[in-house]
């Protein structure tokens, strides 16, 4: 509602699904398709500039923002909070809700974030995050893999990392500044 109050046209989804709707699909695929369909709806609206669509989320929502930004080039600005990490960290300290067959042998999360380049990306992680979760030091390690891609594409100004004073949450002022600047 905060973004809507600021004048943005928003679609707010609740990504709480932890079981498959169809047996031959992956949970992440189903979640991502739902979000892509939201973008499909947005681009049909006369009030929406299709070149100025952003996405944002925290935790599982931050993961889904990562996936949507990576897989749908209509997203021009992605804000992913409480999720910049490594698969090793999540494997040891979190639920398996992020995992699907084969993902670990192919990529790490930094590789998926790299697919957003050269488009705009802001990642946020809280300095008061739980020690076993999405900590700033681990986020900085993942960022070391993302930054060179933005550099190679001459888009370093399109990559932001905000280690904020909070915990597992969105730093609202920096998110608003990011969208005000880029959308």
Regions found by a protein language model. Give the residues of each.
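Gly/Ala-rich beta-loop-alpha elbow adjacent to hydrolase catalytic centers
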Residues: 57-61, 65
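Alpha/beta-hydrolase-fold catalytic nucleophile elbow
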Residues: 14, 56, 81-82, 124, ...
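Cap/lid segment of the alpha/beta-hydrolase catalytic domain
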Residues: 1-51, 87-93
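C-terminal catalytic histidine-bearing segment of alpha/beta-hydrolase fold enzymes
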Residues: 144, 150-183
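Active-site signature of alpha/beta-hydrolase-fold catalytic machinery across serine-
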Residues: 67-71
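Mobile cap/lid helix-loop segments that gate and shape the active-site cleft of serine hydrolases
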Residues: 75-114, 118, 130-142, 151-155
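Residue in the alpha/beta-hydrolase core beta-strand immediately N-terminal to the catalytic nucleophile
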Residues: 52-54, 77
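Short beta-strand/loop motif that positions the catalytic acidic residue
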Residues: 116, 123-125
């Amino acid at each position: 509602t905060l973004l809507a109050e600021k004048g943005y046209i928003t679609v707010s989804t609740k990504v709480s699904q932890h079981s498959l709707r169809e047996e031959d699909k992956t949970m992440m695929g189903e979640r991502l398709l739902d979000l892509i369909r939201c973008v499909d709806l947005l681009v049909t609206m006369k009030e929406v500039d299709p070149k100025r669509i952003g996405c944002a989320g925290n935790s599982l929502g931050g993961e889904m923002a990562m996936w949507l930004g990576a897989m749908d080039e209509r997203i021009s600005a992605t804000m992913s909070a409480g999720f910049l990490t490594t698969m090793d960290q999540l494997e040891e300290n979190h639920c398996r809700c992020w995992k699907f067959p084969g993902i670990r042998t192919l990529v790490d999360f930094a590789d998926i974030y790299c697919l957003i380049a050269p488009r705009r990306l802001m990642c946020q992680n809280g300095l008061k995050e739980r020690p076993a979760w999405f900590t700033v030091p681990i986020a900085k390690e993942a960022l070391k893999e993302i930054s060179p891609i933005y550099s190679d594409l001459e888009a370093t100004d399109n990559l932001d990392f905000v280690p904020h004073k909070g915990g597992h949450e969105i730093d609202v002022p920096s998110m608003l500044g990011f969208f005000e600047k880029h959308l």
